[in-house]
């Protein structure tokens, strides 16, 4: 077994599988934080909550799990052609499935390297009034707690796609 920062090479798992902490929503109150297993000190409402997978009352490296492929396990392509009275339509498609990508930089951290804030951070970040948000609380790059640097499933997204590589209509 070989563990990198957020990937793992382990027998029986895909090569370079994602090996991450499991995000479990966000803390919504100081009371919830006081009754939870947290990472370090300084945890505030709106911060990412992590699952304690091994139930040892602490969040540590043993709470990471394999949670997706870095490399697609399925690659496919197909084409078709239809003809009618001298008119022909043909297309070629290509895609991949069962692959995950990890967002980083300004997508996962507002104000990254002096950049601005994406619209999603302004509209979809956690606030005391919006506990059902898609993103954690908005913070500056230097104001981010250490626990936000933990590589976790909050920023893991499905990267499967199907694209039309060629579309041709002829007469």
Residue ranges of model-derived segments:
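Conserved small-residue
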Residues: 1-69, 130
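Extracytoplasmic gating/loop element in the C-terminal half of outer-membrane beta-barrel translocons
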Residues: 10-17, 30, 39-45, 96-171
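Glycine- and acidic
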Residues: 61-64, 73-75, 149-156
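Core subunits and conserved enzymes of cellular information-processing
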Residues: 73-75, 81, 143-146
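Structural signature of outer-membrane beta-barrel channels/translocons
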Residues: 81-85, 170
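Outer-membrane beta-barrel pore domains and translocons
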Residues: 83, 94-96
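Repeated loop/turn-to-beta-strand initiation elements of outer-membrane beta-barrel proteins
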Residues: 86-91
